[in-house]
Amino acid sequence: MKNGRTYFAISSVIFLVVLAISPLKDFFREWKWYQYEYNDLVGGLPQRIKPADIGIKQIWARKLDRIDRCVTCHLGLKEKALVESKEPFRSHPQIYHDFEELGCTICHEG
């Protein structure tokens, strides 16, 4: 009987530790750090650029039946003030189509 209680106690503690750690996976997602870094970058610029809302961003290219989530990290695509910034925050060079309509992977292949 005592042996069964020991196993139950150990498995309960392990379960609680796993349950407590699980929400941390979302907190430490790589894309969040890119968004925090972007917000720090635009906060230090003389131009007024709206900081990014923290979260997954996507472009739904309906005509191509494709969803691109590149803009979750590549946040400065439209910002002319970021033309000299490092990747992934650099603004995109002039293109002849609206990337919000066609997305990124159609040209960049993923």
Q: Model-predicted segments: where are they?
A:
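Short sequence/structural segments immediately N-terminal
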Residues: M1-G110
